[in-house]
């Protein structure tokens, strides 16, 4: 097994000591991509391995690195997509761009709205997410929530929109 496969497996499983050992052998793995276009940080975020995320951040990983695949998403998008609120909070606290766009122009707030994840929507807005931001197709997070019949998200986003006005 190649080092990239070993470190991505360690990131998925939250094996921080293994991550450290592999990075000592091969420092370039910190921001390396696996065959699916993901970095160790993307995978640690997606699987909610907060201790591994903390370790990678402490070692200087690129918090804004885009996946080398059709999603072109950042670690923040990966964490939101799998409802990993602790990882999202950590990334935002460490400087991740809450309004960063992935392929198609979607932001983390668009993804949380699609999923109907109220707690994630609240966190993202509290951390500065733009509720009026549009995807490449012109849709706002509210329109995404409506389109996907996420009633609680529609209600919540409407409240935030009304409070903003």
Labelled PLM ranges:
Residues 29-30, 63-65, 98, 131:
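Ankyrin-repeat inter-repeat connecting loop/turn
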